[in-house]
A protein has these predicted regions:
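One-carbon transfer enzymes
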Residues: 1-128
């Protein structure tokens, strides 16, 4: 299954490492470009890990751009896994992978969106 990983947090690195270790066919990764990365807290560089895999790398400051959409289409993706991105991903991007698009987040959405979702969930008294 042709898979793409999206993200810029520790979770994205874990997704990439785990899928590759399990023998998945990871064909690409989307990471923030330098401009976007410099504005994000908890940024973890995923691109250096991607460089060691031979996967295609796409750097962008807008996950919903026409350029990113066309990049997704060219890769003929079956599945996309997203772990840590700062934008809401538009339906036209979500609809590209044939088998689906899975997003991973460490709190309930939309209530827990934003930075430090686990911390804020605890501060707010969430029990799940």
């Amino acid at each position: 299954m042709r898979t793409v990983i999206i993200g810029n947090r520790k979770l994205a690195r874990h997704l990439l490492r785990h899928t590759l270790a399990e023998g998945w066919n990871v064909v690409g990764a989307v990471v923030p470009d330098g401009k976007l990365a410099s504005r994000q807290a908890n940024f973890v560089p995923v691109s250096e890990l991607v460089a060691d895999t031979g996967c295609r790398l796409h750097e962008t400051d807008d996950i919903n751009s026409t350029e990113t959409f066309e990049w997704f289409q060219k890769l003929n993706i079956d599945l996309c896994l997203c772990g840590g991105w700062s934008q809401i991903i538009e339906p036209r991007i979500l609809d590209v992978p044939k088998r689906g698009f899975l997003g991973f987040h460490s709190s309930r959405l939309p209530e827990g969106r934003g930075g430090a979702p686990v911390n804020w969930s605890l501060i707010d008294g969430a029990d799940e």
